[in-house]
Amino acid sequence: MAVGKNKRLTKGGKKGAKKKVVDPFSKKDWYDVKAPAMFNIRNIGKTLVTRTQGTKIASDGLKGRVFEVSLADLQNDEVAFRKFKLITEDVQGKNCLTNFHGMDLTRDKMCSMVKKWQTMIEAHVDVKTTDGYLLRLFCVGFTKKRNNQIRKTSYAQHQQVRQIRKKMMEIMTREVQTNDLKEVVNKLIPDSIGKDIEKACQSIYPLHDVFVRKVKMLKKPKFELGKLMELHGEGGSSGKAAGDETGAKVERADGYEPPVQESV
C-alpha cells in the first residue's frame, strides 16, 4: 500500500456528511409593487429579491420584472376577465414603481365567446401613441342575429367582414394615435374602444362581444423618471409604508368651478 494521506477522509471528515443548510430567504427582502395612478388600488402585492451584495444591486434585479394582475384586483371590481401586465421601471425605497406593459383577456372568456352559427371577425394594428410608445392592438368581434330574424345562422358575407375589419383598424388607430399611454390605458379599463367599434359597425352587420382582446408593447421611448413619477402621482414617489392606497371619484356638478380664494 502506498504511504500517504487518504485525501477523501481528511478533506470532508465523514464520507457523505451533510452540509450546513442555509435558509435562502434569510438573504432576501420583500418589496411592495405599486400600480400607476390610473388604477383605484395602488398596492398590488409584494415581490422578493436578493439583498445587495458587492456589485450585485437589488434594484437592478427588480427592474424589468413583469407582473400580471387581474383588472378586478386593480379596480376593486367584479369584472375579472381582463389581465393587465405591469413592468417595474424604477425602485424608490421599498417600492417598485410599475408602468403599463400589456393587456390580455382570460382564456375562459375567449373560449366562452366563440360559438357556432356566427362569424368571428379579428383585426390587429400597430399604432404609436403621442408620447412614443408603439403598441400592437388585437380586436375581436362576433356577428349576432338581427331583430326579428328567424334563420338560425348569422354569417356575414366576405365583403362585410372586410368592411368591419377596416372599421376596427380605423377606430383603433384613431383612438391610440391621438392620445398618450395614460389616456389609452384609461380607455382600455372600461374598453370604450370595443363599444365604439360595436356602434360604428351596426350599419354593416350587427355585432356583439366586441373587445380589444390583447395589447402588446412593441417599443418604448427612453426611460424618464419624471414621466414615471407623473404616472404615479405623489403616492408613488414617497417611500410610505405598504397599505391599501385606494382612490375615490369626486362627483361634481357640470360647469363646476372652484371658489376664488381671497388670500393665499
UniProtKB/Swiss-Prot annotation:
Recorded GO CC terms: cytoplasm; cytosol; cytosolic small ribosomal subunit; endoplasmic reticulum; nucleolus; nucleus; postsynapse; ribonucleoprotein complex
Sites bearing N6-acetyllysine, chain numbering: 34, 56, 249
Phosphoserine sites (modified residues): 237, 263
Covalent cross-link Glycyl lysine isopeptide (Lys-Gly) (interchain with G-Cter in SUMO2) as placed by the record, residue numbers: 34, 249
SMART domains (UniProt xref): Ribosomal_S3Ae
GO biological process, one term: cytoplasmic translation
PTM section of the record: ADP-ribosylated at Tyr-155 by PARP1 in presence of HPF1.
GO molecular function, one term: structural constituent of ribosome
Cell compartment(s), UniProt: Cytoplasm; Nucleus; Nucleus, Nucleolus
Role of this protein: Component of the small ribosomal subunit. The ribosome is a large ribonucleoprotein complex responsible for the synthesis of proteins in the cell. Part of the small subunit (SSU) processome, first precursor of the small eukaryotic ribosomal subunit. During the assembly of the SSU processome in the nucleolus, many ribosome biogenesis factors, an RNA chaperone and ribosomal proteins associate with the nascent pre-rRNA and work in concert to generate RNA folding, modifications, rearrangements and cleavage as well as targeted degradation of pre-ribosomal RNA by the RNA exosome.
Name the record gives this protein: Small ribosomal subunit protein eS1
